[in-house]
Amino acid sequence: MPKLLLLHGPNLNRLGTREPERYGRLTLQDIETRLRSICDAAGVQLCSAQSNHEGELIDRIHAAADEGVEFIVINPAALTHTSVGLRDALLAVALPFIEVHLSNVHAREAFRQHSYLSDIAEGVITGLGADGYDFAARAAIRRMGGQA
């Protein structure tokens, strides 16, 4: 069974209560439930993790390569704009990935408009709220050869 890894960066564990006017009212669990339904219907195993710590996310990316993960959907959150380490981890495992952001980072502060990951991603989805995760999962499934 193909495997898709869903990774969430810092502060995303606060979804639903953190700035709901910007990030929406769905919780991280709500988003994962939606994606699990999409993946189950396509015969894809969904693995997921969230961490507020860069090193834990890097360790999870490294482990993904050893676990047979074929594709990653990642919302690196604030690490988007700061983490060379996350970039290097993704390059090291050479797994395709889609970068997702709930808010439109290009309509926000200047420091949020640079990503250390976008140029090495298969694609970037930004500003579509939780729907962005759905679109990313479906695109990843198709790229793994499945139907979504």
Swiss-Prot record:
Q: What is its EC number?
A: 4.2.1.10
**Which UniProt key words apply to this protein?**
Amino-acid biosynthesis, Aromatic amino acid biosynthesis, Lyase
GO BP terms: namely: amino acid biosynthetic process; aromatic amino acid family biosynthetic process; chorismate biosynthetic process; quinate catabolic process
Q: Which residues bind substrate?
A: 75, 81, 88, 102-103, 112
Q: Which CDD domains match?
A: DHQase_II
Pathway it belongs to?
Metabolic intermediate biosynthesis; chorismate biosynthesis; chorismate from D-erythrose 4-phosphate and phosphoenolpyruvate: step 3/7
Q: Where is the active site?
A: 23, 101
Q: Which Pfam families match?
A: DHquinase_II
Residues at site: Transition state stabilizer? 18
The entry lists its GO molecular-function terms as:
3-dehydroquinate dehydratase activity
Its biological purpose is as follows: Catalyzes a trans-dehydration via an enolate intermediate.
Outline the subunit composition.
Homododecamer.
HAMAP family reported for this sequence: AroQ
Q: Please identify the protein, giving its name as recorded.
A: 3-dehydroquinate dehydratase
Naturally occurring in which organism (per UniProt): Halorhodospira halophila (strain DSM 244 / SL1) (Ectothiorhodospira halophila (strain DSM 244 / SL1))
